[in-house]
Amino acid sequence: MPRALKTNSPTDLGTAHCRNHAYGMWVDYRTVQEALRQRTGLVVCNMRGNHADSRHIHRLWSASGEYCVVGGVRVTTPACTAAVCANSMPFMPAMEVMCWALRNGTSSTEIIACATREGLMNANARNVFRFATPFAENGGEARALAAMILCGFAPPAQQVEFVDPQTGKRYRVDFLWRTRDGRIVVVELDGLVKYRDPQMMDGRTLGGVIDDERERSDGLKRAGVDVIVRIRMDDLYVLEGLKQRLARVGVPLRRR
């Protein structure tokens, strides 16, 4: 698709999803499926073009026209790509893109400047800019962070390290909160791939992987963690159920 657009219109700088994949940004498959179902693309163009919108293509005019070339295709810069996605995508997938950009060296200042310059500031973009962090290590963690924000919980600390006093092993947790009564609550995102992908299993049997997870939980408890909640990707699509689970263990709500 981006190559076709490049051929037909030299002013087009690529569609949102094509830009994301060109950079390797995090976009979950359900978001891509929905975009394909709608059969509509958002294309960023510079101001020299005179092409109107069509049934399947909506053009967003760019004042700067800044772009990079990836694989022979012109695409918007990472900062402007994140800004466009924050403006036009739902909160959860927009958070995935924004967290990717921050983790890979694009500054929030640069992204916000692009959004301001291009007139992309709206309520969704402001929320994305407020809550996105560079600490998510993959798209699943970015989506989990977004889900917990949508549930109304306070932003968690991320990638906090604990040392097991018994074994000396170090463990980093995905998400952490400290409750008012002093307890430490940890949420870990479990991907089924770790139980299926031979590379992630690292030569271990399924039983060995499960034993390692149990050892990790025991080590975290010895290091001072009071509650460990394990969630899966499917939980991120049933927000009411996720909210109830985390509320039961005392995860603090966000102050409005």
Report each predicted region and the residues it spans.
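Surface segments flanking catalytic/ligand-binding clefts of nucleic-acid enzymes
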Residues: 102-256
